[in-house]
């Protein structure tokens, strides 16, 4: 695919590689970016493991309104591209989307335990992260396999990104998906990648903290539970990470460029 210079192909490919290197994506999951030249289309890779994407040939352009390929002769794409199209349709400020099946986050989608920000790098999670259950929206002819296979299911998922009226932001950064994974959004590829990575990191930290807290509760020493970020620290740390995301991004790009596994010909 011959793309205009304004399309961030190299950044997109680096983002896919970074997400794979950090175990946010494996053979499955995907990254997308809105077309900076026309907001009614977006780009994803063809049906390929993220770590193997290497050039613009691997990209497919889709219409936002129905997730159909702009070029009908495009190679096969991901089934769940409706996750991305419906988020772009509803939230014009969103420029990039990540969908992940990370195993460290999955327990928070099936246990009733809320994923909450507990470190300064994850204030973007907000006071609580909603958990979307696709089973509530199946129609009679839908495949009941948890995948977002059509526009209707994608639209229901997208609704979960609408923040409460009390929130200063109009869009949530992350939504969990019951038994499936999570989806993160951002105003750029680096921001959505950062949020996906630190969603996984926060889940790791919270899980270990809950284990230690449970052990402490059984002992003789003092026990005060887990200290999650209060509202004012959530706001402050979210602003902090929005300003500093490129520091992480530049390091991550260098790591995948020198890692040996990945190829970026863009």
Swiss-Prot record:
Record note on cofactor: Binds 1 zinc ion per subunit.
Protein's recorded name: Decarboxylase tropJ
Catalytic machinery residues: 80 (proton acceptor)
Pathway annotation from the record: Secondary metabolite biosynthesis
Organism of derivation: Talaromyces stipitatus (strain ATCC 10500 / CBS 375.48 / QM 6759 / NRRL 1006) (Penicillium stipitatum)
EC numbers on record: 1.-.-.-
Gene of this entry: tropJ
Known cofactor(s): Zn(2+)
Superkingdom of origin organism: Eukaryota
Keyword Metal-binding: yes
MF terms in GO: actin filament binding; metal ion binding; oxidoreductase activity
Keywords: Metal-binding, Oxidoreductase, Zinc
């Amino acid at each position: 695919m011959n793309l205009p210079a304004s399309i961030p192909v190299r950044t997109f490919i680096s983002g896919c590689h970074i997400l794979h290197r950090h175990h946010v994506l494996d053979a499955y999951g995907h990254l997308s970016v809105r077309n900076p030249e026309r907001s009614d289309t977006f780009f994803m890779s063809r049906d390929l493991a993220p770590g193997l994407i290497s050039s613009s040939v691997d990209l497919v352009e889709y219409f936002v309104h129905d997730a159909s390929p702009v070029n009908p002769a495009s190679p096969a794409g991901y089934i769940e591209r409706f996750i991305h199209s419906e988020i772009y349709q509803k939230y014009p400020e969103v420029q990039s989307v990540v969908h992940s099946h990370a195993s460290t986050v999955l327990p928070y989608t099936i246990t009733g335990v809320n994923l909450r920000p507990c470190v300064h790098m994850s204030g973007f999670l907000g006071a609580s992260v909603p958990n979307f259950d696709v089973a509530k929206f199946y129609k009679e002819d839908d495949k009941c396999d948890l995948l977002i296979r059509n526009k209707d299911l994608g639209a229901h998922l997208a609704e979960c990104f609408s923040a409460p009226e009390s929130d200063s932001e109009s869009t949530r950064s992350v939504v969990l998906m019951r038994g499936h994974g999570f989806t993160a959004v951002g105003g750029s590829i680096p921001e959505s990648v950062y949020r996906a990575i630190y969603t996984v990191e926060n889940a790791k930290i919270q899980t270990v903290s809950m284990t230690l807290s449970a052990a402490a509760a059984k002992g003789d020493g003092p026990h005060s539970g887990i200290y999650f970020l209060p509202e004012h620290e959530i706001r402050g740390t979210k602003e902090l990470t929005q300003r500093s995301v490129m520091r992480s991004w530049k390091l991550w790009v260098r790591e995948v460029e020198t890692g040996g596994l990945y190829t970026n010909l863009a």
